[in-house]
Amino acid sequence: MQKLVLLDAYALIFRAYYGLIRSPRINSKGQNTSAAFGFINTLEELLRKENPDFVAVAFDPPGGTFRHEQFPQYKATRDETPEDIRWAVPVIKNFLTAYGVAMVEVPRFEADDVIGTLAHRAAKDGLEVVMVTPDKDYAQLVQPNVSMLRPQSGAKGYERLGVEEVKAKFEVENPLQVIDLLGLMGDAADNIP
């Protein structure tokens, strides 16, 4: 079975940047390269360990999404993106282009939406799909042939979540119920009450 690996760009970029915040990687020009360094290392590790046939990286588009239109306060409490991350994104995109890795960015839709659509279609076409993100929201997308890899906090490696692991972790009968559970819990990171 062929394998497709889908990466949530900004979730992994932010994780790389803040993961190295106490010992940032600074280049000879004085630029903080932690976000690019960490993201590229993550990609390299995934290519080596997962050995995918296909890889795509989904980026959130500039500007708002349809969620902002429906709920103007969506993500309104988040801090401004650090300048070091804004600097790193084009560097990362250049690297992905050089590697021949597909990048996907759809106006008005978050990377989560894009990855969900691609994962569903690819699984339907018989591919094994691995979604790579620290974002727990993706657990609702797990199904047969679609799993999730979550980078571990403070440790190396990943937590692999398939259908059974999602059911056990979230105490649900079906991964589709994760969306209901998270909706009831609210989400402070996205400013959802």
Where are the predicted features?
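Non-catalytic, usually N-terminal nucleic-acid engagement modules in DNA/RNA processing proteins
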Residues: 1-56, 60, 66-73
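Extended two-metal-dependent nuclease catalytic cores across DNA- and RNA-processing enzymes
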Residues: 22-26, 76-193
